[in-house]
Regions:
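Active-site-adjacent structural elements that line small-molecule/cofactor binding pockets in enzymes
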Residues: 1-304
Length: 304
């Protein structure tokens, strides 16, 4: 099993100048052996709209730094760790530009980028309104996501022909394939709805699933993905399964035994990588680096 790291990108980062903070965290994570470094991709959110943000009485919104710019900055200061958004809602940027951005990150990082995408969560409606972005219904967003995935695969093929979708049209998908990974940067899809699970089975190289939900719910979702894979005649084992663990793992100078038990249970469900949040205090980070990573790397993943 692997350990990934999520770092925050909000205006609550106050310890030091942003660039210095990112360099320090990224270089530490790269040396420590974290498998992947992921960042959230939002522009601004009201903390009351989602349980994933801490409430701050001084700021009515959590303003985010632009995710792909941050990843490019981090790529220049790291050598090994994989890089991704977790994830980019396809309604936030024009899709062909998003694919080219991921291609460029893959080239800059010498083959360490994912194209991390999702259908844009419901709690992002207010964020879209503030940025002047349309926010279609949930069903349309999922349909748009599938079209974006089809577009990405055609762009990566280098085939010179138009892309004619219901929502997006390109005159030609010819272009120099700048990316390093072959056949293309891996697709990471995050979500949990039934329509999203079908897209995961059909298009994803990696999935992020769970988001703080219980083990029983996660087991059910994974079985649905497995069923879709069987229907598509695609090996379920081709897909890397990841989840974001929201709770603190370090407690009073020790790893929380309950957290470790939960991570072991994730591995029994077939989760290949658990993403943890970057802790605020250096001692907790050191504990993750020196104790959590080697412990988790020795946990076998069911089905592997």
């Amino acid at each position: 099993m692997r350990v990934g790291l999520q770092i925050a990108l909000t205006n609550n980062i106050q310890q030091e100048p942003l660039g210095e903070y990112l360099i320090r965290v990224a270089e530490q994570a790269d040396r420590a052996g974290f498998a992947t470094l992921v960042v959230p991709d939002h522009f601004s959110l009201r903390p009351e709209s989602t349980a994933f943000l801490q409430r701050d009485g001084h700021n009515p919104t959590a303003d985010f730094f632009e995710a792909w710019s941050v990843l490019a900055f981090i790529a220049a200061r790291t050598k090994r760790i994989k890089l991704s958004t977790l994830v980019s809602g396809i309604t936030m940027r024009y899709p062909a530009v998003l694919v080219k951005t991921a291609d460029t990150l893959d080239a800059l990082s010498n083959g360490r980028a994912y194209l991390g995408v999702g259908a844009s969560p419901n709690f992002g409606a207010d964020e879209h309104q503030r940025m002047g972005l349309p926010f279609p219904s949930a069903g349309e967003r999922v349909a748009r996501l599938e079209e974006v995935l089809q577009m990405a695969l055609q762009l990566w093929s280098g085939e010179d022909k138009p892309f004619e979708g219901t929502y997006y049209q390109l005159a030609s998908t010819i272009g120099t394939p700048l990316f390093v990974q072959r056949p293309h940067p891996p697709i990471l899809i995050a979500g949990h709805g039934n329509k999203m699970l079908r897209l995961m089975a059909k298009y994803a190289d990696a999935i992020s699933i769970g988001f703080g939900r219980g083990l029983d719910d996660l087991r059910t979702k994974l079985e649905i993905v497995r069923g879709h894979c069987q229907a598509l005649n695609r090996p379920y084992e081709q897909i890397q399964k990841t989840t974001l663990y929201m709770a603190p793992i370090a407690h009073e100078g020790h790893l929380d035994p309950a957290a470790l038990d939960y991570i072991r249970a994730l591995a029994e469900l077939g989760i290949d990588e658990v993403m943890v949040r970057f802790p605020a205090d250096p001692a907790s980070f050191d504990l993750l680096a020196t104790e959590l990573i080697p412990t988790v790397e020795n946990i076998p993943v069911a089905g592997r």
